[in-house]
């Protein structure tokens, strides 16, 4: 069973304890005697938990908390990937729709230009025929 100790109890340990390592790794251990091992766990930014490891409970709790955190991050990552896949599918669908719309509009524009070109060609032909008729009549007179 793990037993919490106050900082005052640990203040006499001096150079045998380095809390910098605990801050960096999250967990640190220091051998206090031949059988006793001190476990230091970073709980929050500047808060450390000191406990004497006797039967491994502190590490079991820590491992369980780490596993829960890891599972949470894994689940959130899977959700984010699924959302990303949905977003990709939506963008592809909208791109296809935009492409189809642009193609339809281009076809309409082509049909309009073709029709107007035919009308202009017919008017030009009529104009030329009229002028040719006038020229023909002018040469007869």
UniProtKB/Swiss-Prot annotation:
Source organism superkingdom: Eukaryota
Localization annotation: Plastid, Chloroplast stroma
GO cellular component, one term: chloroplast stroma
Residues bearing attached sugar chains per UniProt: 99, 137
MF (Gene Ontology): galactose binding; lipid binding
BP terms from Gene Ontology: cold acclimation; defense response to fungus; leaf senescence; response to abscisic acid; response to cold
Residue interval of the organelle targeting sequence: 1-41
Coiled coil: none
Induction: Strongly induced by cold. Accumulates in response to abscisic acid (ABA). Accumulates during compatible but not during incompatible interactions with the downy mildew pathogen Hyaloperonospora arabidopsidis, and thus belongs to compatible specific (CS) proteins.
Keywords (A to Z) from UniProt: Chloroplast, Glycoprotein, Lipid-binding, Plastid, Transit peptide
Miscellaneous information on this protein: Predominantly unstructured in solution and mainly alpha-helical after drying.
Role played: Exhibits cryoprotective activity toward stromal substrates in chloroplasts and in protoplasts and confers freezing tolerance to plants in a CBF-dependent manner. Protectant against various stresses (e.g. cold, drought and heat stress) by preventing protein aggregation and attenuating enzyme inactivation.
Assembly and binders: Forms homooligomers which interact with potential stromal substrates in the stroma of chloroplasts. Interacts with the galactose headgroup of the chloroplast lipid monogalactosyldiacylglycerol (MGDG).
Family: Belongs to the COR15 protein family.
Name of the protein in question: Protein COLD-REGULATED 15B, chloroplastic
Species: Arabidopsis thaliana
């Amino acid at each position: 069973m793990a037993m919490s100790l106050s900082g005052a109890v640990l203040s006499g340990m001096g150079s045998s304890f380095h809390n910098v390592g605990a801050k960096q790794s999250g967990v640190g251990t220091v051998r206090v005697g031949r059988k006793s091992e001190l476990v230091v766990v970073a709980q929050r930014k500047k808060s450390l938990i000191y406990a004497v490891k006797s039967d491994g409970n502190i590490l079991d709790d820590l491992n369980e908390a780490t596993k829960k955190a890891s599972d949470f991050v894994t689940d959130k990552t899977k959700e984010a990937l699924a959302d990303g896949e949905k977003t990709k599918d939506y963008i592809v669908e909208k791109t296809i729709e935009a492409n189809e719309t642009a193609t339809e509009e281009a076809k309409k524009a082509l049909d309009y230009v073709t029709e107007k070109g035919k009308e202009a060609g017919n008017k030009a032909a009529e104009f030329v025929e009229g002028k040719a008729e006038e020229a023909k009549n002018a040469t007869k007179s």
